Structures are given as C-alpha cells and as structure tokens.
C-alpha cells in the first residue's frame, strides 16, 4: 500500500474495463465470495472437481493466511488466498502442474469429461481491452507476442509465485512446466522447446 493512508484507503476509481492494476486483495475477495457460494473450504472443492478427476497426487496443498478464518454455518473455515506468499497460497509439484496444464490445453476437458466449461475457458483466454496479455486470474496471454516473441500468439501460460510456470502450446499439443525460471528466460526456453518439437 501507499505510504499515504488517505491514498491507500481512498484510491482513484476507474470505470470497469478501463484500468488494470495487479492486486492480491481483489483475488482474496473473490476467494472469500466463492467460499460463501460453495459453503465449504475451497481446497475441498478444488480436490473434488479438478484435482481428483485429473489424477493429481495427494501432495498438493492450498493454504490461507493464518488470519483468514471466517465463521460459516457455525464452524471456523479458512478462506484461502490466491497468492503464494505471506504464508498462503497453493503448493504443487511439477507433475500436478503438468496435469493442470494438460487440462488447460484441452479447454477444461479431461478424458472426455468437461471439468471446466469451454465458455469459461474462452473467457479466461480472451485478452482484456486494457491489458491484452492478460486473461482471467493467472492466464497470461501471448496476444501481442511481446513476452514470448518466439512463440505463436495463441500460446498462454499460468504463472505462479517464484516463476513456477505452466506453458501451454496449443498448436503443438504440448505443455511445458518450468520451475523457478527467471522472467527473462521464458522466451528462450519456449523457443528451444519449439525448435526441439519440429
């Protein structure tokens, strides 16, 4: 937050769809709203509807912050965060990342079962008017080929804390998982993968 609390507490407002600002608070509010819709811990929902159907391991974890407990239906439930810092977030191995990437590659379908709707997937990978390299949440897009000039415009990636990345290359029917990759190394890695696939 800004040092000036008046600026932080009363930020300038922009009309929806006219501005972009990376901010975990909005993700955490979305997580809390989603928790209120499902009325049960979101890690349970993710496990039942996504992770178990894609055959994920039992080692992944999704934690909330220590101070993110809420009273729901007479029980204390942790509202999980979207980010992997300050003690919260998702912790996932490369194997499970690849499986999630494969689900994304196939537009939410896993072994013939549609786990995420194609309509949702289309929205998630549609560039926003204000930031053409960003879709929903952690769907980063190569629309203008600025981040990955060596890759086609339809390549996208999921980016996690520490530059843990799932690259999805639809034309090649291929997923690449990279762990702790420096940001400036992304294009070089994808370029080498594309060259190796030819």
Region roles according to the model:
Residues 1-66, 88:
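Catalytic-site signature segments of enzymes, centered on catalytic residues
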Residues 20, 120-130:
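Extended ligand-binding clefts on enzyme/binding-domain cores
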Residues 24, 34-41, 49-58, 94, ...:
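Sec/Tat-exported extracytoplasmic proteins
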Residues 26, 38, 42, 46, ...:
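Stable alpha-helical elements in mature extracytoplasmic
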Residues 54-124:
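Active-site-proximal binding-pocket segments
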Residues 68-84, 88, 126-175:
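Active-site Gly/Thr loop motif
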Residues 186-198:
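Short, gly/Ser/Thr-rich active-site loops of penicillin-recognizing serine hydrolases
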């Amino acid at each position: 937050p800004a040092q000036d609390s008046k600026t932080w507490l009363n930020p300038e407002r922009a009309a929806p769809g006219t501005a972009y600002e990376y901010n975990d608070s909005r993700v955490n509010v979305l997580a809390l709203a989603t928790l209120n819709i499902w009325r049960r811990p979101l890690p349970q929902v993710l496990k039942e509807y996504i992770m178990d159907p894609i055959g994920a391991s039992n080692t992944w974890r999704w934690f909330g912050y220590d101070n993110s407990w809420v009273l729901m239906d007479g029980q204390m439930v942790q509202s999980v965060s979207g980010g992997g810092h300050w003690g919260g977030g998702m912790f996932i191995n490369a194997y499970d990342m690849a499986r999630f990437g494969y689900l994304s590659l196939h537009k939410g379908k896993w072994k013939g079962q549609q786990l995420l709707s194609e309509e949702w997937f289309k929205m998630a990978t549609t560039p926003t008017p204000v930031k053409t390299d960003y879709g929903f949440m952690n769907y980063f897009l190569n629309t203008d080929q600025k981040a990955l000039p060596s890759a086609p415009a339809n390549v996208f990636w999921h980016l996690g804390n520490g530059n843990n990345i799932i690259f999805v290359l639809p034309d090649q029917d291929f997923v690449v998982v990279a762990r702790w990759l420096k940001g400036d190394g992304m294009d070089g890695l994808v370029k080498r993968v594309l060259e190796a696939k030819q």
